[in-house]
Amino acid sequence: MQRGAVLLGVVALLVLWPQAGAELYDVNDPDVRAMVIDGQKLMHDCAIANDYIDDPWWTLNLGAFEEKRVYHSMLSELVFCLNAFLQRRQQAP
């Protein structure tokens, strides 16, 4: 079930990637806010699925994402997390 949720999140991320990379980034915009919150939830779910001990992104409030750089850092780490998840599942018997 977790695998399906993570894969669904990957699909959603790929579909919404152009929106995430847009030049205008205002965390008060409802669409941007939704992307940040959903990305944060997906990162948290991926951390749980990979049995990570600590997920620093989950503890950040919305104000911490006012800088686009912070959001892009989280997305970059999410890609590594999802790759680790998929590699681990491929190696499982």
Curated annotation (Swiss-Prot):
Subcellular location: Secreted
One function term, GO molecular function aspect: toxin activity
Prosequence residues removed at maturation: 23-33
Keywords: Disulfide bond, Secreted, Signal, Toxin
Signal peptide interval: 1-22
Tissue specificity as recorded in UniProt: Expressed by the venom duct.
Gene Ontology CC: extracellular region
Major subcellular location class: secreted
PTM comment, free text: Contains 4 disulfide bonds.
Domain notes: The cysteine framework is C-C.
Family recorded in the similarity comment: Belongs to the F superfamily.
Protein's UniProt name: Conotoxin Mr105
Lineage of the species this protein comes from: Eukaryota, Metazoa, Spiralia, Lophotrochozoa, Mollusca
